[in-house]
Swiss-Prot record:
E.C. code: 1.2.-.-
Classification via Gene3D superfamilies: Luciferase-like domain
Family the entry assigns: Belongs to the mer family. Phthiodiolone/phenolphthiodiolone dimycocerosates ketoreductase subfamily.
Keywords carried by this UniProt record: Lipid biosynthesis, Lipid metabolism, Oxidoreductase
One Gene Ontology molecular-function label: oxidoreductase activity, acting on paired donors, with incorporation or reduction of molecular oxygen
Organism: Mycobacterium tuberculosis (strain ATCC 25618 / H37Rv)
Pfam families given in the database record: Bac_luciferase (PF00296)
Protein name per UniProt: Phthiodiolone/phenolphthiodiolone dimycocerosates ketoreductase
Lineage: Bacteria, Bacillati, Actinomycetota, Actinomycetes, Mycobacteriales
Amino acid sequence: MGGLRFGFVDALVHSRLPPTLPARSSMAAATVMGADSYWVGDHLNALVPRSIATSEYLGIAAKFVPKIDANYEPWTMLGNLAFGLPSRLRLGVCVTDAGRRNPAVTAQAAATLHLLTRGRAILGIGVGEREGNEPYGVEWTKPVARFEEALATIRALWNSNGELISRESPYFPLHNALFDLPPYRGKWPEIWVAAHGPRMLRATGRYADAWIPIVVVRPSDYSRALEAVRSAASDAGRDPMSITPAAVRGIITGRNRDDVEEALESVVVKMTALGVPGEAWARHGVEHPMGADFSGVQDIIPQTMDKQTVLSYAAKVPAALMKEVVFSGTPDEVIDQVAEWRDHGLRYVVLINGSLVNPSLRKTVTAVLPHAKVLRGLKKL
């Protein structure tokens, strides 16, 4: 069973380097390593608490990134990256907020990028996170309802054929609205939805071209959720097999198990486990530090966490949970883990190189070749 494809995703953090240099370097690496796509995040600030974004926990990366919460705007950056885009590489946002941006503006931005890239834009979209909405006055009581309406609005505008369109909606009503940008050669950007809960999975089946969850931790959970997406697609009269089963996953690798275990103990890496719902923690006999019923990454507000709070939370992360949250191990072990997910339906993985945040510069450098070996191995799956 083959056909697995992969892409890279980077955070758009302002650094001491020229704004586009890190992204263009990653794009070049993606091309060399055979990646299908390059993605950027969409955040007003970081998901890493600023209280631990120091050299003590980030190592040399903290010298290049003096302010972890200084994030570039993704669509502006993607427009720049579209110039000189390597052949066949696709560009995507992973993922944009459905509520913080009016869906008409999102539809326009994605359609513009699709024209700039000659049909290689991907619109990744989800509910977003509380940290990028509520502090800025965006209503957050019903994020899933807003998401459903945003997705329906984008599709309605793209399918309007340049005719006036009116549509009732509790969040994004259209009254004689006009959307006249053309698709590229008859095709709109693919919509990839970051869905996890039942309603989001149903919306994915109705509207999306791909499903790209971020916090599904077990392959068995992945296959069950994929069935829900496909069932919703069938109910909507769509071909369920036309929806690409994807996922965003971090990779922690190194020369040997000792290096990997050391990287997994990083406070910054452990913070990713806070984004996992409380029920996943409970399976390992530990209550989520933010409450047994905590929903996960969408409700974290990291900029308010002080150092002691972060360290106390990190100390509670079960080692077994950490190994579910990311692919980890030697290159061969990581490839075997990805293969297991493939056997549960995964066909596309968007990768975060978690080895880059090791506080040890030497360990970060020595993880480069093992990471490249993983990527070469993925092309054979």
